[in-house]
Amino acid sequence: MASQGTKRSYEQMETDGERQNATEIRASVGKMIDGIGRFYIQMCTELKLSDYEGRLIQNSLTIERMVLSAFDERRNKYLEEHPSAGKDPKKTGGPIYKRVDGKWMRELVLYDKEEIRRIWRQANNGDDATAGLTHMMIWHSNLNDTTYQRTRALVRTGMDPRMCSLMQGSTLPRRSGAAGAAVKGVGTMVLELIRMIKRGINDRNFWRGENGRKTRIAYERMCNILKGKFQTAAQRAMMDQVRESRNPGNAEIEDLIFLARSALILRGSVAHKSCLPACVYGPAVASGYEFEKEGYSLVGIDPFKLLQTSQVYSLIRPNENPAHKSQLVWMACNSAAFEDLRVSSFIRGTKVIPRGKLSTRGVQIASNENMDTMGSSTLELRSRYWAIRTRSGGNTNQQRASAGQISIQPTFSVQRNLPFDKTTIMAAFTGNAEGRTSDMRAEIIKMMESARPEEVSFQGRGVFELSDERAANPIVPSFDMSNEGSYFFGDNAEEYDN
């Protein structure tokens, strides 16, 4: 990749850093984790939570959401200008769960946003510590990616539900910065751009005037982010066309959908980071571990090691399976919603099963759910091996297509052969071949047609024993690759036949 030199590593994005060496990056990421941990400890004290209650993932989510809401400047400004009945724009809160007389009780807490901001800054040496906020946003995004398949959002914009593997980060807020942009999938960027273009079609003033100029800058920036995710010259050239369009309209939407489809084979590079809930960092800091001093990385062994020794609990509804709830959270912690189930199973050391076979709903509990029957259990978040998180999307070399797996965007840098039914995808490319992008389209289609599934199309490293911190002895697992190991589609394989 020619532009590799100008790219910053995730950790730099994560910490808004200038060029830093590995040790400095590890320290600044560690500092960010320390801040989240200290904040969480302080919030547990404020809320008078017991150790067990502080390790409850539902309480963690509420506390994380409170601080994100306290720092959401745009929304805060909007709320103050458009007061709605019964909502105090200066306050934030949510459900906190406590154990009372052997039962779980829900208690709604309310805090001044100013107070939450003070506690957060105090935990972060007086800084706003945006990197820590983004980190929590990415954890929420990874949890959403694991819990929900964005079928409706895809269909509404004219994309195919099978493209769900391109939708990483689709629930990340716009304000999530460079670190957020790095983890967004190709489909997520395409969706954002299509929504923008549609607004422009329906509202003549969208691109006009002073506001329109800002809109245009945002549009071009999003185009450049998406372009940076593509790894072939033709895909990038098409993105230039979309970006330079005088008046973006249906032709651009068509081009974007074409590009999204092409990304099923010519995979984009999308970052994966292991972002853990605050209730993991808090107890670690409380036990005296100094993340900044020890150094920490979101893409190496560190999150695995941290999860090996963490106790996290979750509320469980009467008919939910605690092991399934654990799998859901394990996948979210490892950013593995779009990874091949066989790779995940090997790393985890227990079978990871498709979403449709999980007897569990989301982690959050709705306000109208009955607490009387609510139980709780320990989440099993440990792993048998660890592996490096990848950013490559699984292509061997940038200029030649290699068979990317249809419903998978690799998370772990682990070598695997790919099963791959090209005809299914190629069928999506019949139709419009004329227009200004025809030569690029033709080139992209040619690259896809020449993609040979028998190549080992994901040249990764392998997995490592948890004792192998330096990643010295890769173990390359052999997988039975006769079928797709897709999380969202694994339970209805006949979808591939029709």
UniProtKB/Swiss-Prot annotation:
Q: Where is this motif: Bipartite nuclear localization signal?
A: 198-216
For this protein, what post-translational modification is recorded in UniProt?
Answer: Late in virus-infected cells, may be cleaved from a 56-kDa protein to a 53-kDa protein by a cellular caspase. This cleavage might be a marker for the onset of apoptosis in infected cells or have a specific function in virus host interaction.
Location in the cell: Virion; Host nucleus
User: Which InterPro entries does the UniProt entry name for this protein?
Assistant: Flu_NP
Write out the GO MF terms.
RNA binding; structural molecule activity
The task this protein performs is described as: Encapsidates the negative strand viral RNA, protecting it from nucleases. The encapsidated genomic RNA is termed the ribonucleoprotein (RNP) and serves as template for transcription and replication. The RNP needs to be localized in the host nucleus to start an infectious cycle, but is too large to diffuse through the nuclear pore complex. NP comprises at least 2 nuclear localization signals that are responsible for the active RNP import into the nucleus through cellular importin alpha/beta pathway.
**Record text on subunit structure and interactions:** Homomultimerizes to form the nucleocapsid. May bind host exportin-1/XPO1. Binds to viral genomic RNA. Protein-RNA contacts are mediated by a combination of electrostatic interactions between positively charged residues and the phosphate backbone and planar interactions between aromatic side chains and bases.
Q: What is this protein called?
A: Nucleoprotein
State the species of origin.
Influenza A virus (strain A/USSR/90/1977 H1N1)
Gene assigned in the entry:
NP
